[in-house]
Amino acid sequence: MFLNSLKLKDFRNYKSLQVDFSNSINVLIGDNAQGKTNLLEAIYILSMARSHRDNNDRDLINWSSDFSDITGEVQSKMGKFPLEVRITRTGKKVFVNHLTENRLSDYIGNLHTVLFAPEDLDLVKGSPGVRRKFIDSEFGQMSANYLFNLLQYRSVLKNRNAYLKNIKWIGNNPKIDEDYLKVLNDQLIDFGSEIIFQRFVLVKELEKYSYQIHKAISRNEKLTIKYASFSGIDDQSTKEEISKIFNNQLLKNKTRELFLKSTSVGPHHDDLKFSINGKEVGSFASQGQQRTTALSVRLAEIEMMKYETGEYPILLLDDVLSELDGDRQTQLLNFIQDKVQTFLTTTSLSDVERDLIKDPKIYQVKGGTLVNG
């Protein structure tokens, strides 16, 4: 899979841009705050219909305009076709082959991307929310069914939390519509159990690829990745067993949730556990081991996406070479060479990096403009 070209209109600091890309490695060189990361962000939005770093779409629009437009030509096993994301002050629309897609689940999956940025260290040492965002973002690109269940679950969760928040109390007694709460619980269990079951399957697959890559670049250290959900659930559990335990947990925590006014159990509270030789990475590993783990997982993601979709994704490397030592730089660049279209940002390329990258297409980025370097 390749992104042949990109057009930006009033996106961040880009008033207008039209650029063609190499199917190999594209290097974006420039000082800080010139637009390198903005360009990677535009490609990510074209893939996922949302930013990886900003929750407010209005901030993506150039200050002098009322809308922003991102258009790209994708080349995949399905042929060539345009994707477009149009962002206004009041919302956004997405288009595939010039036709509006009303459902996000139908749009995502047309352009597969893997993003690797310095903050990916948070993947192993950050909060569980960072890791949930990672698996939802990547698994959602690989599986339309996973994405559908995830979006439905989030919708039901939002409705359930709103209901819990608005329950009126008379003294110590809440006035509950038990029938309505049961409908919400049943929907939450249905979609949530599917998510948990699929996460176990996909995390097991991710662990398989990560283990082999990590072993090769870490002198035979053994990396394990485990999905942590409800007590009593593991990767051998059936959907029926997961549903039963989920239901029991909701019943057990009912009083607590009425006081909290939010849903305290479910896959939106689950986590990933990374271990090297049996020791938890976030707590006991060195910074070098944490970086090797993050790198291994991202490279595994590329291979897993190839296996699941039949095509390599596009790789977005946002200023990560400066965060990696020479050995890890070599491992990364050798891995992607000649098989993955890559977009790499940096303030400068060292002589070593230039030797490692074969025939890169270099762009100089300055003030929202690109010039072939």
Swiss-Prot record:
Entry keyword Glycoprotein: no
UniProt-recorded Gene Ontology molecular function terms: ATP binding; single-stranded DNA binding
InterPro entries in alphabetical order: DNA-binding_RecF, DNA-binding_RecF_CS, P-loop_NTPase, RecF/RecN/SMC_N, RecF_2
Gene Ontology CC: cytoplasm
GO BP terms in the entry: DNA replication; DNA synthesis involved in DNA repair; double-strand break repair; SOS response
Sorted UniProt keywords: ATP-binding, Cytoplasm, DNA damage, DNA repair, DNA replication, DNA-binding, Nucleotide-binding, SOS response
Binding positions for ATP per the UniProt entry: G30, D31, N32, A33, Q34, G35, K36, T37
Xref: Pfam families: SMC_N (PF02463)
Localization per record: Cytoplasm
Stated role: The RecF protein is involved in DNA metabolism; it is required for DNA replication and normal SOS inducibility. RecF binds preferentially to single-stranded, linear DNA. It also seems to bind ATP.
PANTHER family: DNA REPLICATION AND REPAIR PROTEIN RECF (PTHR32182:SF0)
Membership in a protein family: Belongs to the RecF family.
Protein's UniProt name: DNA replication and repair protein RecF
